[in-house]
């Protein structure tokens, strides 16, 4: 008898809990709006051609260029990013180059 009550109560609790809401987070810095996002390997060959290949040595992931910070609060109230919204781990030259970028969706 108690096993049935326990089983029904467990299923009811799972049904009421529902799915968890997943939100985009940027724990490593500010959310950026970048005009262009490319794999680091795309830029490594160009940097090597001009003799600056060692600057991106060891950099993996994506690199954003011409980025400007946006806030999640602003994004939900109508601020728009007409390019790629990303979360980057390292911002250089006031957003001209952002390293370690990961695309995110701020509309979720």
Curated annotation (Swiss-Prot):
Database matches in Pfam families: Hydrophobin (PF01185)
Intracellular or extracellular location(s): Secreted; Secreted, Cell wall
Cellular component, GO, one term: extracellular region
Cystine pairings recorded for this chain: 26-87, 33-81, 34-67, 88-101
Lineage: superkingdom: Eukaryota
Swiss-Prot/TrEMBL induction comment: Expression is not regulated by ammonium and glucose concentrations. Expression is down-regulated during preinfection stage (12h) of ectomycorrhizal interaction with Castanea sativa roots.
Residue stretches in coiled coil: none
GO molecular function, one term: structural constituent of cell wall
Segment forming the signal sequence: 1-17
CDD domains listed in its UniProt record: hydrophobin_I (cd23507)
UniProt entry keywords in alphabetical sequence: Cell wall, Disulfide bond, Secreted, Signal
Annotated PROSITE patterns: HYDROPHOBIN (PS00956)
Binding partners and assembly: Self-assembles to form functional amyloid fibrils called rodlets. Self-assembly into fibrillar rodlets occurs spontaneously at hydrophobic:hydrophilic interfaces and the rodlets further associate laterally to form amphipathic monolayers.
Function: Aerial growth, conidiation, and dispersal of filamentous fungi in the environment rely upon a capability of their secreting small amphipathic proteins called hydrophobins (HPBs) with low sequence identity. Class I can self-assemble into an outermost layer of rodlet bundles on aerial cell surfaces, conferring cellular hydrophobicity that supports fungal growth, development and dispersal; whereas Class II form highly ordered films at water-air interfaces through intermolecular interactions but contribute nothing to the rodlet structure.
Family: Belongs to the fungal hydrophobin family.
The name this protein goes by in its record: Class I hydrophobin 3
Originating species: Pisolithus tinctorius
């Amino acid at each position: 008898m108690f096993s049935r009550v326990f089983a029904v109560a467990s299923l009811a609790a799972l049904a009421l809990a529902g799915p968890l809401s997943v939100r985009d987070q940027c724990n490593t810095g500010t959310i950026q709006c970048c005009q262009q996002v490319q794999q680091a390997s795309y830029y490594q060959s160009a940097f090597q051609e001009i003799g600056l290949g060692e600057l991106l040595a060891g950099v993996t992931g994506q690199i954003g260029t011409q980025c400007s910070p946006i806030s999640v609060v602003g994004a939900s109230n109508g601020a728009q990013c007409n390019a790629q919204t990303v979360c980057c781990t390292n911002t250089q030259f006031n957003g001209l180059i952002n390293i370690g970028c990961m695309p995110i969706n701020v509309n979720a």
